Curated annotation (Swiss-Prot):
Belongs to the Hakai family. Keywords: Cytoplasm, Developmental protein, Metal-binding, Nucleus, Phosphoprotein, Transferase, Ubl conjugation pathway, Zinc, Zinc-finger. Gene3D superfamilies: 6.10.140.2210, Zinc/RING finger domain, C3HC4 (zinc finger). A zinc finger (RING-type) spans 109-149. This is E3 ubiquitin-protein ligase Hakai. E3 ubiquitin-protein ligase that mediates ubiquitination of several tyrosine-phosphorylated Src substrates, including CDH1, CTTN and DOK1. Targets CDH1 for endocytosis and degradation. Associated component of the WMM complex, a complex that mediates N6-methyladenosine (m6A) methylation of RNAs, a modification that plays a role in the efficiency of mRNA splicing and RNA processing. Its function in the WMM complex is unknown. It catalyses: S-ubiquitinyl-[E2 ubiquitin-conjugating enzyme]-L-cysteine + [acceptor protein]-L-lysine = [E2 ubiquitin-conjugating enzyme]-L-cysteine + N(6)-ubiquitinyl-[acceptor protein]-L-lysine. It is an enzyme of class 2 (transferase). Its main location: nucleus. The HYB domain forms a phosphotyrosine-binding pocket upon dimerization, and mediates as well the recognition of its flanking acidic amino acids. Pfam families: zf_Hakai (PF18408). It comes from Homo sapiens (Human). The gene is CBLL1.
Length: 491
């Protein structure tokens, strides 16, 4: 062992004597190496081994050396730690990040998956990729958009934040240069499905508006009245008050309107026959038409006590149009009688019609009065007591006399009135002449018999038509409501 040790020592330091020197030199070399920071661990071990053998001064030196070594090592360790783990020192401090949030969205290229700083916008399809991918794709000779495979005419270069991408529908990804254009695209392409719904809802809304008129006859009737205003202004005024009564027959309202429109033509055709009595007859006819009760009242005068029964028989005998008409309003009444007379030959059928009408009319007119103005019935009885002829004769004079003043302005037009008189001339005048030829003078003479009898038979009509007759005392109770209704229109 010793020999081998000596050999080893000799090899190391060329002699056993030099072994100590070698050992001494080793630490020096190690120190030099320590300066180089090569092997700190073996030095410590060797110094520890040398400590007991060395003298106290050697110990002091070793201590000093150790202190330096430790110092050096500590320094080295600190630097090494800083280099290896710099975070340990700096992460102990609070860091304030300065800057502002950027609201500009960042889009990613569908080709390379990287965020796009400069867009390559395909022109007609408006899809975007990063400019590099777009140029590469174009250089390859592909004139198709990689996203939608649409042909590409050119590529636009756009900066980040200058494009607005559609994200309403996943996969659209079309880009626009302004928010307005993007919104227009959304409304045109993506909201189209919703638009039909809105349009349908609007259409549904409009139809309901039309039905209400049918449901509310008053509204539905009002427009026709306006149309008729030009032809029959007074009748229109009269129609305004009665609408509340018109609730009963909706279908009848529609029919009367049509009838009203149709008869005027017939009436216009009819005027030529008798114009001599056109004014008087016209006025009488208009009043009769407006009330429609005048003809039945005449018949009623013949049948003294029909007032109570009329309500019941009226529905059965009366034509649906007639019933609806009385309820509708005076204008309707005026027109329907014309219709009844107009369809048949003016002279002959009218006469026959009034004749059958008395029973029917007796019921119907009363029904009309019961529905709209019952007073005529009550007022009619006193005049009914006198001979029917007187009532009939008185009726025409009343009609003739008052119309000259107030009615002409109300009716405002002979054209409409002319046709009814023709129809009525055969009906009313022949009847009057047939019943009592002597009574015809009273008709012409409004002062004689007319004043007393006018109120009774024509009670219901005058309130709407003539201010004078209704004002007369004979018809105070029943007619006052009607007068209140119609006065505003005439005044």
């Amino acid at each position: 062992m010793d020999h081998t040790d000596n050999e080893l020592q000799g090899t190391n330091s060329s002699g056993s004597l030099g072994g100590l020197d070698v050992r001494r030199r080793i630490p020096i070399k190690l120190i030099s190496k320590q300066a180089n920071k090569a092997k700190p661990a073996p030095r410590t071990q060797r110094t520890i081994n040398r400590m007991p053998a060395k003298a106290p001064p050697g110990d002091e030196e070793g201590f000093d050396y150790n202190e330096e070594e430790r110092y050096d090592c500590k320094g080295g360790e600190l630097f090494a730690n800083q280099r290896r783990f710099p975070g340990h020192l700096f992460w102990d401090f609070q860091i304030n990040i300065l800057g502002e949030k950027d609201d500009t969205p960042v889009h990613f290229c569908d080709k390379c998956g990287l965020p796009i700083k400069i867009y390559g916008r395909m022109i007609p399809c408006k899809h975007v990729f990063c400019y590099d991918c777009a140029i590469l794709h174009e250089k390859k000779g592909d004139k198709m958009c990689p996203g939608c495979s649409d042909p590409v005419q050119r590529i636009e270069q756009c900066t980040r934040g200058s494009l607005f991408m559609c994200s309403i529908v996943q996969g659209c990804k079309r880009t626009y240069l302004s928010q307005r254009d993007l919104q227009a695209h959304i409304n045109h392409r993506h909201m189209r499905a919703g638009k039909p719904v809105t349009r349908a809802s609007l259409e549904n809304v409009h139809p309901p508006i039309a039905p209400p008129p049918t449901e509310i006859p008053e509204r539905f009737i009002m427009p026709p009245d306006k149309h008729h205003m030009s032809h029959i202004p007074p009748k229109q005024h009269i129609m305004m008050p009665p609408p509340p009564l018109q609730h009963v027959p909706h279908e009848h309202y529609n029919q009367p309107h049509e009838d009203i429109r149709a008869p005027p033509a017939e009436l216009s055709m009819a005027p030529p026959p008798p114009r001599s009595v056109s004014q008087e007859t016209f006025r009488i006819s208009t009043r009769k038409h407006s009330n429609l009760i005048t003809v039945p009242i005449q018949d009623d005068s013949n049948s003294g006590a029909r007032e109570p029964p009329p309500p019941a028989p009226a529905p059965a005998h009366h034509h649906p149009e007639y019933q609806g008409q009385p309820v509708v309003s005076h204008p309707h009444h005026i027109m329907p009688p014309q219709q009844h007379y107009a369809p048949p030959p003016p002279p002959p059928p009218p006469i026959s019609h009034p004749m059958p009408h008395p029973p029917q009319a007796a019921g119907t007119p009363h029904l009309v009065y019961s529905q709209a103005p019952p007073p005529p019935m009550t007022s009619a009885p006193p005049p009914i007591t006198p001979p029917p002829g007187h009532i009939i004769a008185q009726m025409p004079p009343y009609m003739n006399h008052p119309p000259p003043g107030p009615p002409p302005p109300q009716h405002g037009g002979p054209p409409v009135t002319a046709p009814p008189p023709h129809h009525y001339n055969p009906n009313s005048l022949p009847q009057f002449t047939e019943d009592q030829g002597t009574l015809s003078p009273p008709f012409t003479q409004p002062g004689g018999m007319s004043p007393g009898i006018w109120p009774a038979p024509r009670g219901p009509p005058p309130p709407p038509r003539l201010q004078g007759p209704p004002s007369q005392t004979p018809l105070p109770g029943p007619h006052h409501p009607d007068q209140t209704r119609y006065r505003p229109y005439y005044q």
